[in-house]
Amino acid sequence: MPKKVFQQEDVEQKITENFEPKQEFEQDELDIEMDCSQFETTMDRQNTDIPFQHMVRPKVTMWQKLLMATICLFSCGILAQSVQWLVDSWRDNQWIAFVFAMVSLFLVLLGLGTIIKEWRRLVQLKKRLILQEKSREIRSKSAVNLTEVSSEGKELCLKIASLMGIDDKSPQLIAWQEQVHEAYTEQEILRLFSQNVLIPFDRVAKKLISKNAVESALIVAVSPLAIVDMFFIAWRNIRLINQLAKLYGIELGYVSRLRLLRMVFVNMAFAGAAEVIQDLGLEWLSQDITAKLSARVAQGIGVGILTARLGIKAMEFCRPIAVAPEEKLRLSHIQTELLGTLKTTLFSANKVKEKVR
């Protein structure tokens, strides 16, 4: 192996090339701002939401089919027995038994009517989710398919307007119909419908979500009873989902409400709501804000963020057209108002108490 000779000057030159001149920072010049958009964009790119088709069309197992068949046979048997009891009581002149038979038949019919009503509301919810799936398919079409002009997008929008109960003479709907041109693609028609017809509904929904998030945070931050907070926040979250569903024209029954709640909570858990809260908590910690806040205020912030996350997911499920990335409501849109309201309300109250003392 040939001998290599190194010069001291060459070694020092290579070492100095790997170093950069030092930079000094003053504490006053550091300004850390909370920005959730980068984290949320990363989560969106990861595509953490549960595949939509699994929620819209879940697989029905054999046990579920057997259970539904058993319930149907049992309901038919109860109805037939009630009618038979009514006929026998009338024929035998047993008037007391006849009254009981009438009451039982009324209760059976009431129960069957409730079941049919719940089933219709479930079908309505499923139709809304299927419309969302169709809008997603239209938006995901390739550029080759977009060149084919089709009336499918316009028919879908008119069907959505009918399901939402929007009047044909509505100014927003008329403005959308005037802007639609034959040369427009399905994606452009959906975008115009969303901008002209659905944006007013989205604004009301965003106000509801922001209002409920701030109020929930204040309630938890002020209230000393954890059990009362738990039930009260649960009631307010269910009420928020009902308001959003009613806003977008969905009539929820007991079963359909449970199903919507299940889809929202499962999607929240899968999307990593805890990671969002952890990220926001680290940002607040970097600003040294948590040192000024009490434990109750920190809990209020966490509850407010969870309420906002719940409202955002419920809005995405209730909206008839899938939310586009530029239309999506983010936590960063709510956290500024949430933190500002808490600081203004609680810190001003503490200052008033100190002045009184």
Swiss-Prot record:
Pfam families: DUF697. It is a multi-pass membrane protein. GO terms for cellular component: plasma membrane. Keywords: Cell inner membrane, Cell membrane, Membrane, Transmembrane, Transmembrane helix. The chain crosses the membrane at residues 67-87, 96-116, 213-233. The keyword Transmembrane applies. It is found in: Cell inner membrane. HAMAP family: UPF0283 (MF_01085). Belongs to the UPF0283 family. This is UPF0283 membrane protein HSM_0945.
